[in-house]
Regions:
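NTP-dependent small-molecule kinase module
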Residues: 2, 17, 21, 25, ...
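ATP-dependent small-molecule kinase phosphotransfer cores
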Residues: 33-92, 139
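A glycine- and Lys/Arg-enriched "phosphate-lid" helix/loop adjacent to the NTP-binding pocket
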Residues: 96-137
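P-loop (Walker A) phosphate-binding loop of NTP-binding proteins
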Residues: 10
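Hydrophobic anchor at the beta1->P-loop junction of P-loop NTPases
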Residues: 7
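Conserved glycine(s) of the Walker
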Residues: 14
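Short glycine-rich anion-binding loops that position phosphate/pyrophosphate groups of nucleotides
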Residues: 81-84, 106-108, 153
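Post-Walker A helix-loop "phosphate-sensing" segment adjacent to the P-loop in P-loop NTPases
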Residues: 24-35
Length: 168
């Protein structure tokens, strides 16, 4: 097995949960970009947004992604933040640093989860989430090597593992 298995997708799409299942199945480490960013600055992402704004958070996120894509041992699983694909620089970094899987979870399914609560960019409700989805979908598609359709954690994990194992 080789390289980094990188997960992208909307906030609350299951990147960390599915990443953990993949890491267990592959017996490799999981690196959660949002958790590492929080650990680095010593406060939560909502606190960073409230105190410093989205631009400051995106700069921190970029530094975290650079570290994960250059300093982590491979193989590993990396769960990115939902906005990791917002800049061309980040998309290029992710694509050249591993195999990128887009967890394409529909808005209705994201809204139905408890873990959507407390996420700064999901605070605007369903209309805001649909607008965010419309903007980000083309960016996820441009960054991903593979699109992963929605399903249970096990279904999505197994789908990714089949693709991962078949990729040269």
């Amino acid at each position: 097995m080789r390289g980094r298995l990188i997960l992208i997708g909307m906030p609350a799409s299951g990147k960390t949960t599915i990443g953990a299942a993949l890491a267990r199945a592959l017996s490799v480490p999981l690196y959660d970009a949002d958790a590492l960013t929080e650990q680095t600055v010593g406060c939560s992402i909502p606190e960073i947004f409230a105190a410093e704004g989205e631009a400051a958070f995106r700069a921190l996120e970029r530094r975290t992604l650079e570290a994960l894509c250059t300093e982590t041992e491979t193989p590993c699983v990396i769960a990115t933040g939902g906005g990791a694909v917002l800049t061309e620089q980040n998309r290029e970094l992710l694509r050249r640093s591993g195999t990128v899987f887009w967890l394409d979870r529909p808005v209705d399914n994201i809204m139905s989860t408890d873990y959507a609560a407390g996420r700064p960019l999901l605070a605007g409700g369903e209309a805001a989430l649909r607008a965010l989805y419309a903007v980000r979908c083309p960016l996820y598609a441009a960054c991903a090597h593979y699109r992963v359709p929605d399903g249970t954690v096990d279904q999505m994990k197994d789908y990714i593992l089949r693709l991962w194992r078949d990729t040269p």
